[in-house]
Amino acid sequence: MNPIRKQFQYGAHTVSFETGEIARQADAAVMVDMAGTVVLVTVVGRKDASPHGDFFPLTVNYQEKAYAAGRIPGGFFKREGRPSEKETLTARLIDRPIRPLFPDGFTHEVQVVATVMSLNPEVDPDIPSMLGASAALTLSGLPFKGPIGAARVGFVNGAYVLNPDGSVVEGSELDLVVAGTANAVLMVESEAKILPEEVMLGAVVFGHEQMQTAIRAINELAEEVGVTPWPWEPSAVDAALVAAVDELARAGLGEGYNIADKQLRQQKLKEVRKAVIDALTAEGAHDENAVKRQIEKLEEEIVRSNILHHGKRIDGRDLSTVRPITIRTGVLPRTHGSALFTRGETQALVVATLGTGRDAQLIDALEGEYKENFMLHYNFPPYCVGETGAIGSPKRREIGHGRLAKRGVQAIMPTMDEFPYVIRIVSEITESNGSSSMASVCGSSLALMDAGVPTKGAVAGIAMGLILEGEEFAVLSDIMGDEDHLGDMDFKVAGTRDGVTALQMDIKIDGITPEIMRQALHQAREGRMHILDKMAQALPAPRSEMSDYAPRITSFTIDPSKIREVIGKGGATIRAITEETGTSIDISDDGVVKIASVDKQAGLEARRRIEDITAEVEVGKVYEGKVARLMDFGAFVTILPGKDGLVHISQISDEHVEKVSDKLAEGDMVKVKVLEIDRQGRVRLSMKAVE
């Protein structure tokens, strides 16, 4: 049991790979340590191919263990439960660059499991997990065309930073994760604070250059371990099947891909596919999965050829035209903000809801709890593509698309100081034919403006495709669903008129150069400007008035030492204020008070009462107060909540007063002037000084 270790410097951190000691019954297991963040990544492949051999059954699981951060899980069971949103997103991040590196026809089930075992809060486990998955797949002997490298790139003070610490990322204008092989970029996931396209592209190139260090280290580790390749060979091309499918399907598929309407097109293609499969599988002549795969290849060839050689897309558009856009805002009467964004056959109904501080989402992250004041949820019900299906908790894809849309919108959101509301956006995809996540970005921007949120401009998103054959390539603007999986690169860009806020790329082949990416980003910018123009026609600026049904939040500051007085014994005082005024009140430890109410006057009344409680008595000021109790020598008058002062009998009137009760009774409202506050805090009042 002699572990093999490989160590290298990666940005500011030292990374080590170790294999051979832990999880030895897996096909491969690598322990990755990056500055104290330790991830165990295992790979297991089934030796027999899947009986449903028309797809590659790859599963990626990413799990964070509470012990990694020295914590015991909360909840009744005190153990880890269903995956968090962060775990789901990281699993997708690992999956996306490794999936295209398995060969067509490989249908053995493969499972990659990444387990976070130790956490340095400054080092996100996503990069170590991706590197570990790459190393484990390389060592496993599976037909994996890797290894890949992965890097996080920040942009601070005009310079790129490799694998910045978490505290640096918070102040960075860019948080970009890039993954790729030695020769090609495969995946980009990023969020930016409105940066030019050139800066984004530069970050991708920088990250790809830097990750070569990690790729070399994995190759050296594999050499030292000695990898035994799997005994798998791609099945030989069945020339007779290729010819038969071509003869039976080409004409019908060609007709189908000339139908612009999605549902009519899919119906035609379905009929053609069924007829060909029935004809070629009769009496066991050919394997059904092999026929399906060949039909798919022919479809890909037809669509790609039409685009590359004729500049003709499925719905008849040229390469750079965006589908027709229609926009309506304020579509739902009692929501705080809403928008219906339709682009071709993709439609999103997006709703913005404003809430108070107590509506913030409490995230129990591995590095500790924090509050999320902006949420964006994306729903993709089966009816949006004309299908039936289960409706329930969000799937991985919905979580991923929601996060991408949130990244796109985040940069235009006001701070809590500027707009003290917790905001939740929900994007309901009501129709879908490609780029629904980007429709969600556009709809979210419009819904926020409809709700009266003071955004820093509008943001729009567009999904792009790219087809490359040798030296020829075509960039497609605003791709449809059928174009999505037939291209060599699909990427989504969200941004304002001034720059990019989110960029997501998935690249399936080698040969896509920075120059090609630059042209693609330029074309995406043109499309984005067109969409922003359409949005500006519908709603040029945030509404000046919020919905009548949205809470009004009043924010002001009190002396933190007075918080106890506002809350009262057992919360009695603040409870009385909220119940009597119908408001919601939040007080933070630094004395910031936020009062939320749908009725503006109720909010003002609650504020007045809190200010009265926290106010200091001022010498020389006249107050109206209630006589609290009578004494032989004078009367105590309540001038502020919880603050009484004494009106001495000699200060009640200019006339001689024999008995206090001759002039005053308990409960009387009187005007008094503060004469002095002695060292013990006792307040002397006068009624006659007012007269």
From Swiss-Prot:
GO MF terms held by the record: 3'-5'-RNA exonuclease activity; magnesium ion binding; polyribonucleotide nucleotidyltransferase activity; RNA binding
Top-level taxon of the source organism: Bacteria
UniProt cofactor(s): Mg(2+)
Principal subcellular localization: cytoplasm
InterPro entries the record matches: ExoRNase_PH_dom1, ExoRNase_PH_dom2, ExoRNase_PH_dom2_sf, KH_dom, KH_dom_type_1, KH_dom_type_1_sf, NA-bd_OB-fold, PNPase
GO BP terms: mRNA catabolic process; RNA processing
Enzyme category, top tier: transferase
Residues annotated to bind Mg(2+): 484, 490
Homology family: Belongs to the polyribonucleotide nucleotidyltransferase family.
Known role: Involved in mRNA degradation. Catalyzes the phosphorolysis of single-stranded polyribonucleotides processively in the 3'- to 5'-direction.
Protein name: Polyribonucleotide nucleotidyltransferase
Species, as recorded: Methylococcus capsulatus (strain ATCC 33009 / NCIMB 11132 / Bath)
Taxonomic path: Bacteria, Pseudomonadati, Pseudomonadota, Gammaproteobacteria, Methylococcales
Gene it is expressed from: pnp
